Amino acid sequence: MQIQKLELPQGGEQEREQLYIRCLQGAYQTEEQSLKLEEKTLIRFDTYFNACSVEKWLTYTKIQDLFSQVRVKGRGILRIWNEWESPSGGIERKLLAEKQFETEAEELFEISLLDKMSTAEVQGMLYTEIETGEGQRCVLSEGGYTTSTVSERTVHLVIAICTYKRETYVTRNLEIIRKKLWENPRSPLYQNIHVIVTDNGRTLEKHADKSWLTICPNKNAGGAAGFARGMAEALKDDSTTHVLLMDDDVEIKPSAIEKTYLLLALLKDEYRERIIGGAMLRSDYTFVQQESGGSYQGGRIQSIHAGMDLRRTENVLLNERNERADYNAWWYCCIPVSVIKKKGFPLPVFLHCDDVEYGLRTGTEPIRMNGICVWHDAFEHKRPSVNEYYDVRNTLIVNGLYVRGYGCRQAFRMVCRRMLVNLFRYRYKDIRLVARAVDDYLRGPGWLMQTDAEELHRELMSTGYRYTEIFPGTIPEKEDVLLTDILTGKHNSNNIDRKKLLSLNGWLLPARRGNPEPIMAGESPHCYYRKKDVWIYDPDTKLGFYSHKEMKQLFEMPGEWFRLWLKLKKEYATAQRAYQNAIAEMTSMEFWSRYLREKESKNENKL
């Protein structure tokens, strides 16, 4: 069984080339199915997609042996290395095998690996290296890692995609799945996968006449409802063993789905109910990792290995660390059906924090591995007002359920900070949405389960800012965001310089007058320091809205804080207990069946 195949960069992937191959000297040429090395060339596959995570394969799976396979023709030297992170933080490596080859026709070389290393001491990753000397050339046509261990577990994987009016993205991903997996005889998922698309926008073909695809029109009750419907549809087939939740607007990699499937097939019994999580790589800087799992620390989300440049070998190794993760985001998250049956469905929170809450509820750390990922647009400059409402309301729900010792004081501090940051960003409507989120949280789970989520969302959208205006001057391009700032996290920080904080980020000082200054929506509050007029915009659409410094907003803030404090002090404990008591009902199959059915009925009555 091949557990990992050697991947070569395809056309249009120049920026990602070092995620596949590293050239230390000489030159090479890539073709569709082969790699040609010129003389005096040295290449390594110690990369994100081609290094073998041997330590994780041996930890989580039943494999008893491991072989490296390389198909080449020509002359050169083949080497297999084991590389790991030393206790001091450096990189150590050991040569496991070296083979000189000289062949006029393609020849497959297979090297046994585990007998060359102590299984108890296996660390890090394995990789292949090929070198040609003077007058030597070769062509690499195939490679990978195999095991003779036979899978004893039947895996039937269902991919559940939730979408809302993103036909282009969904169609593209479905085509990739069809061509690269379902119709590909060389894929382990050949005619052994099913895709369920929950269509919250009702814009896709209703009945897909395809054995591998089901499209389910669904009420737009948010991503949580879309994924709940996908889970429910998957569970109708008793043969389904795992549900892979996936966002509609990601760029998928077929080999990631194949690796997920192979991991599931070979997992040790003690890990059979573990979730497998995929990392998110940025779609603008495609070699930068945005997150590989996340931790939830006292109510604050911490992305693991964020801003990591995966072109660097040391970062590929660092990514092998099993740092504790509490959840994996649902842009790529594979959940065993047995876990869904035991732990239930998502909370009906529309969007945001549904994946965090589910990870905390299951209480199991997701398995993550290099190469299992998707590409997705980064979030720092997509800041719709409505997100403030969902972030605050849903964070209050999650913290009350899972953060020990969380009470009204902690909730009040979180709310005050959120409102203050919005004040510093001149987003006064968002301040009111934060307050609305607190009020709605205190209404309790009964209100949450009975409210019409689509109507609420529509109302919230009309309450917040809209990116509809065009700036008459020149605005910075999205690409002007410095890569160094992304790698260090400076581009997306709410931290404010202490000196600026003493003046409330310039609110206690005279504003600098002048023409409105364009500021990207996700920029840090310090970018607004002493600004009078600003134009806040989305760099993707180039649309935005005007705002300016209003002193009355500063003076009104203490009164709103006082109102919220009194309300939290009086009602928070009751609401918290109510959510704790209702969690089982809110995440049950019975609730979701009734909830979605009622939404369908209301929708039909309006027609």
PLM-predicted stretches and their roles:
Residues 1-125, 130-131, 393-394, 400-607:
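Terminal low-complexity segments of carbohydrate-biosynthetic enzymes
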Residues 141-149, 369-385:
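Active-site donor/metal-binding and catalytic loop motifs
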Residues 166-185:
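Short, well-formed alpha-helical segments that are part of the catalytic scaffolds
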Residues 208-225, 233:
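Conserved donor nucleotide-binding strand/loop of the catalytic core
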Residues 238-251:
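Short beta-strand-to-loop acidic/aromatic patch adjacent to the donor-nucleotide binding site
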Residues 255-303:
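Conserved donor NDP-sugar-binding/catalytic core segment of glycosyltransferases
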Residues 306-333, 382:
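A recurrent flexible, glycine/aromatic-enriched loop bordering the glycosyltransferase active site
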Residues 330-332, 341-360, 365-374, 386-387:
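Donor nucleotide-sugar recognition loop
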